[in-house]
Amino acid sequence: MLFRSSAGNPGAPAAAGGRGNNVNNRRYGGDIQGVREELPYLRSLGVTCLYLNPVFKSPSLHKYDTTDYRHVDDNFGYAGDLAELTGETEDPATWKWSKSDKLMLDFVAEAHRQGFKVVLDGVFNHAGSQFGPFLDVRQNAKNSKFADWFNISNWDPVTWISFGGRAGGNMPELKKDPVTGLAPGPRDYVLNITKRWLAPGGDASRGVDGFRLDYAQNVPRVFWVTYRKFVKSVKPDAYIAGEIWTPATSYLAGDAWDATMQYPFANAVQAFFIGGSQKPITATVFAERLRQFNIIYPFQVSLDQMNLLDSHDTDRWASRFVNANHPAPEDPNPTGRGGRRPYNTSKPTELEWQRMEQSIAVQMTYVGAPMVYYGDEVGMWGATDPDDRQPMIWKDLAPYDDPEVTFNQELFDRYVRLIAIHHRFAALQTGFAHTLLADDARNLLAYSRDLGDAHIYVAINKSETAQSVDLTIGPPDKDYAMIDWLDPAQAVVQNAAAKTPDERPQIQAVSRVKPAVTAHKGKATISLKPWGAMILAPASAH
């Protein structure tokens, strides 16, 4: 969320202050230039793709109530720049580029130069109440040329259906059509907006690299089939990810989306490592849930899935370990509104940080594309909106007013290491997954990622005692020496301060390192620390 990132442009509006601004609406001055200036930080973390929450013109903090899809919000760029534009209509031939738009395109160019892809939030199910076509409908009712753009339930007075099926409200839904998905007017507008940002001026190299589609299951599937064909004709390698909180097999058959924000993955990881309204699931159940993700979708889709643990719509991942017994389906709001049990927003303990790190090892090594919500890597915690959308913790802004708020260097280093491991091994990016062990009595889990003759072994001890486990791994006819890539004594992260514009941290085995584990003719004994994890592969492996 740009408002909560970093401020870099003195021409952008200042952050609001004072008691009159409640926490849901308060801005903190983050802007495009600020994110651009932090690209080296994101490189040092190992990130290769940036998904930005909505950047288009909108009156709100969250920007999911779009006023103008053609233009970047001037809060993120240059205040008042849209006033300089005149004569624009819904016709793309009339569209111009504001100074804030150009700043965004410059940002995309710089991000590309530094090795990043950029994915924007596409809010195409609904618009905002200040959206030009909707204002015209409010004024002219059924005589408006945009009368067929929205779900109007009554014309006198004008009454509409908003986001979530609510009557009225400030996010009017775009009209759906059983044949085309969206009514012709908004359908063409959405396609033209998509092309504008994918290929500015017809040049796909200057555009963004894809869209995350907000509340996408509420738009009929037939539209997404059209959308995919259109997007791939403009930019064949563009990424299309739908927001849906349940399995999405019908959308991931190769003719609609490339992937989803895979909330079922987050739910499975939480159910095993934390629990919720019920006690944690067993290792066997967890392994089967993970396996099912690779069965219900084509494997290429599974590789592309956004494997998140939390997001702007959930509580922070770290805080779930603090609230291990909090009912998962309930709103984890710190006030306990509606009679619900209050959420504990205390800072996680050392043990809770350790358990969080263990879960991240699974996120970074299982099938899919790991997605990190900003600030998780430095130890941000909190309940749901607005607590999960606090400003980013930056080292150069320390010390903070709250002495408990600090940049968690140990956690950051663990993220860097795990991401570097993910980048080093092709098997972790495109390899198949196989369960090696699921010991329910001892809370042990082990699996492999396999690509041809390359194998990466992951072992998890989800218990408070050290344990040893026998595994069948490695070739059956010879010894097979492996190091633990999670152990800083066995593998070091290099080039964290990138020397070239597109470089990322790399991990290398320590010279002449002794193996952590040696398999003898396919058999090995692995010793795991309490709440420990190991990632095993030969020292020379890639």
What are these regions (language model features)?
Residues S98-K99, M356-Q358:
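Outer-membrane beta-barrel transmembrane strands
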Residues D304-T349:
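Active-site clefts of carbohydrate-active enzymes
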Residues V108, H112-F116, H126, L135-R138, ...:
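Active-site-proximal helices and loops of the catalytic beta/alpha 8
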Residues F3-T48, P54-S205, Y227, S233, ...:
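Substrate-binding/active-site clefts of carbohydrate-active enzymes
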Residues N22-Y28, T94, K175-L182, R212-Y215, ...:
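Active-site rim elements
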Residues L42, L52, Y69, A111, ...:
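Conserved, mostly hydrophobic/aromatic
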Residues M1-A7, R19-N21, Y28-T48, K57, ...:
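Carbohydrate-interacting/catalytic domains
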Residues G11-G18, Y78-S98, P327-S346, P501-S511:
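Charged, glycine/proline-rich intrinsically disordered loops and linkers
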